[in-house]
Amino acid sequence: MSQELKNYLKLNVKEKNIQIADQVIIDKTAGEVVIGANCLIGNYAFIRPGTIISNGVKIGFATEIKNAVIEAEATIGPQCFIADSVVANQAYLGAQVRTSNHRLDEQPVSVRTPEGIIATGCDKLGCYIGQRSRLGVQVIILPGRIISPNTQLGPRVIVERNLPAGTYSLRQELIRTGD
């Protein structure tokens, strides 16, 4: 950890028992970052402005978090990208989970709810991952999607619509060709 980061943390971190590994980058140039007590932030993580990390959170190696709320006791695996999103209490994200936060057609992100579609007016908006949800490796969540609490997603699922609580996985057919 650089001396500059150590000095910044000494002045700005109020909580105790936070473990921040070497080569972590906390971007202080454009806004505040909040880190709760009893957190572990792995090597080469990049925490960008506007991020709130609640108590007891674990963040894996080389994960980038931008303008997101990570609620208490959530675990975010290595090499994840979490942007403009909320990860609720005790959620678990496996390695390389991605939250997409903008549309390729450059239109504002909207959110579908039971009451109808909310036009957010936001150019960038990620997703909501419900409490105690468990996401397997390489899950991708499209902008404005909601994953209900207690939902489990298997590896490589692409979340294209809101998901009610349940267990979801991809069907794969493995075919042996030749001898």
Tell me the role of every PLM-derived stretch.
Residues G42, R48, I52-S54, G60, ...:
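Transmembrane beta-barrel architecture of outer membranes
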Residues D22, K28, A37, N43, ...:
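Residues on the solvent-exposed faces and adjacent turns
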Residues A30, R48, I65, I82, ...:
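Short coil/loop residues immediately preceding or within conserved phosphate-binding loops
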Residues L5-Y8, D22-I26, N55-F61, S100, ...:
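Short, functional N-terminal and low-complexity linear motifs
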Residues K16-K28, N67, V87-Q90, G126:
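Short, charge-rich amphipathic segments
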Residues I70, I76-D179:
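Glycine-rich hexapeptide-repeat left-handed beta-helix
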Residues M1-G50:
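Extended, small-residue-rich solenoid/repeat segments and analogous flexible loops
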